[in-house]
Amino acid sequence: METKSSYLKFLNEEQRISVQSPHKYTQILAGPGSGKTRVLTARVAYLLQKNHIAAEDLIIATFTNKAANEIKLRIEAILGNSEASKLISGTFHSIAYKYLVKYGKHIGLSSNWLIADRNDTQAIMKRLLDSLKKAKNPIASGIRGQELTPQNALNRITKLKSNGLLVKPGMDQLSLINGLEEPPKELQSHQSVELYRLYQTSLWKNNLADFDDLLLNFILLLQKQPDCVRNIKHILIDEFQDTSKIQYFLVKLLALQNSDITIVGDPDQSIYGFRSAEIRNLNQMSEDFEGTQVLHLERNYRSAKPILELALSIISQDKSRPKKGLKSNHISSLKPHYRLFETNNKESYWIAREIKRIVGSCPELIFYNDIAILVRSSSLTRSLEHALSELGVPYRMVGVNKFFDREEIRDLIAYLRVLANKDSTSLIRVINVPPRNIGKTKIDRIIFESERRGLTFWQTLNEVKNENILLSQRNDKSFLKSLKSFLCSISKLENRYLSNGHSATLSDLLLGILSEIKYYEYLVRKNKETVEEKWENVMELVQQSDNISCIFYELDYKISTIVLLQNFLTQIALVNEEQKEGESQKVTISTLHAAKGLEWPVVFLPCLCENIIPHSRSDDLDEERRLLYVGATRAQALLYLSSFKSVTGMFADMQNSDNVQDVSPFLKGEEMKRWVMESEIVFNEKIASEIGTILGRKSYGKITNLSGIGSNANHNGTKFENLGFQCCRVLAEAELKKRERVKSVNDYNKDETNFRKHNAKRSKTDIRSWFEKKQPIDSDVEISEPSRSASIMVANKDLNDRSFETVNRIVSTRASTTNASFMSSVRQNLGRGPSTKDQVINRTLREGHQDVVQHTDLNQSNTKVASARPAGSRKRLGVRLRVSRML
């Protein structure tokens, strides 16, 4: 634990003034990399120590659970665990949940309500839209005519809720929360209001509340029972520029009890307008709270000076922005690098090559996981993914394959929700998992009867079981038997683990579910190839349930299993589980929005074209500019920016019909040329020393600037296998495997001919002869142009377009990845988006082509030929070929 007030010694003058502010209302405007989390943490410690405020009398609102946990850990390091554990901290939603659990009865909430997460709300809305397809009334017809997707419909409802509009039982019109301004009338179309009413009724019936409801219900609670926050002395809010109208209204209600307010934010980083964030809240606070003191943090500890100069030149284009500076703590002689390319594909391959060049030039100084590629939207990653995969650059996508979104995990969570409160959405998901002869037709009929009779899905199931409700004229004994078996399993689990007198752990409950429904056997029947991977995920859930249980047991060792279960489900709904990555080095591909608050030593900002940034569908030019500013300020040492003139391939479908692109207006003008360089970065000891100082890395390997010029590129005199030769062999291998049916390889190869004699008659056996040849690594022998041309002809003649995509995946990894150390990561990236046939053949086989062959010097001397891949890889390639019907 740090000594009393020692945390103040690590602050600069600006930070110290902010931490010790005596003002009742304080705004701390913190630029990127200026230490806002440190200041917010120190401010909390200062209030607790110097102002003698009790920890339970402070509210700290953040925008992510990760940020809340980080602040709590830092407070714990300063003051100890006992004080930190008493803090009321978390996201607005999690804080609302804590108060609603404790005081929700004052606004009519039951004791066992649960949070509906994204999957639940999607399922509810899908069922509503499906039912409206059959309804015969004008409003239903109007909704059908709009052809809404579940997400579109939910977005409409969120818009209504974020403006404070409520559905009230028995009322056709929406009501506005007292104290809020009336929203535009166009928001409240008959169709939107009816969808909202039906959706909210479905939530109520299932005893659920969605995330928007948490904030609305918290407002209603504070208005009806303000004494529940009477003890709060100080409210601290992080990322204030991202607060919505509803969240700001909550802050005002919390402050009615004479609480002080400290906010930390940066108007230059307000990028969430599409989530109803209101940048105007900063100015509104100064108007609503008289005497608000505005303080600035302008010392940047993250980025090199040239990066900040470029970022400020971009954000300063907004003439309405209050002028404020940003001073760097790091000197660098390297300006941000800018390149303009003919096509998006050339841009992508250049980025992939440059990444390999950086890592190869700066050993032990810059690694793959130090590098990020940040794009305006996820739809722009296809070309980048493909280029990285072809050149053997390992990468990860941020925000995909979330743990709690995996099918097997969703199944088990649904079972837990059924046991917790008979949630209809979860019942519908698991009633036929594993299969029980209860198909979609039966489920739809049960849903219909539930809605017709005003019953919950669970109540209807029991009525059907007791034959009080008939789903068809004939008595379906098989269905009834299956239904009774399902209900019996649920009852058995309740009696065994949740009834009074039993104190089971959550892992006991989960293992009981797995045993009762024979889930492992179900996974085996479903897909033997994926069962082990899925079962590992299931066991991970069991382990996580125990970890979370321990936290609640520490708070209350007498906690019942049912309350423990409800808390566990709430944690799952509140926390956006991040995918657990291995320790392997990987480049990060992320959207600009997802990169907020993060940093990397090296950042690439590609696709900086008009209609991409600013986005063609955005009506807020200033927010788009702020988004680019946020992206630029993620970089610590090296920043690369790039644009292209035209698009090719599938990427073209998303852009202008003429495929012609203009550079982003944010990068135009003579002024911008002052802050960027277009020549290639030359790595040397001086540059490495500057980078090392910025990153705090004092020791690293020998710096060697790798540039690579065509076929003459080489490093330390080592010769490497010709990429075009590899590609020919792989194409030929695929062609041969397509014909290989009965004969063994040896029998097939009896009549070999020398493929290098290009004037010889080409036959099927020529192909085998060709791809078995190995280019001597230690010689200067090159493949002759006639031989290369002949192989192209074979590939074009015998490789049909239908199967080429699959072969291309093999070509991509084998032809472009000669470094054995990259093999593992490339295998993980197999199956990423392919190029067209002409692109691959031309790119990999044409002599002197700059997109692939240029940087052969980046490979290592332990190069292996394409056919010498690990057995597991060959097996996987074979499977892919069989799937594509090539074998």
Swiss-Prot record:
Domain of life: Eukaryota
Localization per Swiss-Prot or TrEMBL: Nucleus
SUPFAM superfamilies: P-loop containing nucleoside triphosphate hydrolases
Enzyme class: isomerase
Domain UvrD-like helicase C-terminal: 305-597
EC annotation from Swiss-Prot or TrEMBL: 5.6.2.4
Family, per entry: Belongs to the helicase family. UvrD subfamily.
Protein's name in the database: ATP-dependent DNA helicase srs2
Lineage: Eukaryota, Fungi, Dikarya, Ascomycota, Taphrinomycotina
Protein's gene: srs2
